[in-house]
Amino acid sequence: MIANRVRLAAGLLVWLALAGFGAEAQDRLRFVMVTHGAASDPFWAAIKRGADRAAAESGVELVTRVPETFDLEAMASLVNAAAAEKPAGLIVSIPNADALASAIKGAVSAGVPVISIASGFDVAASLGALFHVGQSEYDAGRVAGSRMRELGGTKALCLNHELGNVSLDLRCKGFIDGFRGSVEVLPVASDPEAVREAVTERLELDAEIDAVLALSASTAGGPAVEAVRALGDARTVRIATFDTTEAILNAVADQEASFAIDQQPFLQGYLPVQYLVLLYREGVAPVGNVSTGPKLVGAEEAARRLGRPAGAGTAESAVSPVQPLATEPGGG
């Protein structure tokens, strides 16, 4: 932990020494954001909305680039292309460090300050990023597993809809460690209907499964709720999902889902742009990862966000927000 913090601080000092300040720093700044998820997904839409808001407020230019599908090679090419343009800053998600290491390190070597978001909490410093804005995926999974166990779950599914995304692997690993029961990692397609069918089939084959963790609200969380709803009242299956959508918040408020794990994606888009602006204009920046989650959202909080009454109170609806587990100074 200390080594990571020292590495982050050292990288920041080196970049500041190379960049300098003055009139050039006051020119209109241009940043590029490369992520592995598109704005068609509510999670990434919130990130883009936050980044666009920060850019508008700060008077800077922001260009967003995303592969057409989850394609690590294509994403690496986008990072390389962005670095070649020598932007004032690069914001990037890191779903797989091995696949993106060369491109990100190349950007850093070219003198482009890099901030990672969403995926990459545990590897950002080693790749030369100034810091990461997001959450520890392992810790978030562990918090979810522990809470699911408290709610009475004994046998669970962890739905992985994006094979090759190491951050999702870490979520499932944390969930397994926190749950301390039987957990099956179930690979599913990144298509909601296919997810619903896969969950339905698995639940019908194994009547002992009483908990499901989805790693995306829109791709897997909603379909998991639909699959369990179709089982009727004769069986209790607890559902939790990473991230929030209106449908998931309604499901949590109605106690069809136990809780959601919120990592505040708007902040993951907004803060990096503002931090890069501050870096150029004031020469200041965080010296460690910036935590935006995890926060567990239960029925009361979900209803509040929707502006509606929560369902009748039960033990499973009373999920209180939690603080992230400390794994690194300045991080979640």
Language model region names:
Residues R30-A54, S58, V63-V79, E85, ...:
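Extracytoplasmic "Venus flytrap"
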Residues A9-A19:
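Bacterial N-terminal signal peptides
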Residues V92-V108, F175, E184, A189-N250:
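Hydrophobic alpha-helical
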Residues F131-A156, E193-R196, T244-I248, Q264-R281:
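Hydrophobic alpha-helical segments within soluble ligand-binding/sensing domains
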Residues S102-D139, D243-D254, S258:
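Flexible loop/hinge segments that line or gate small-molecule binding clefts
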Residues D27, F179, L267-G332:
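Hinge/cleft segment of the Venus flytrap/periplasmic-binding protein
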Residues A56-T69, L157-C158, F175-R196, A211:
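Short beta-strand elements in bilobed, periplasmic/extracellular small-molecule ligand-binding domains
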Residues P42-E57, A140-A144, V166-V183, A198, ...:
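Short, solvent-exposed amphipathic alpha-helices that sit
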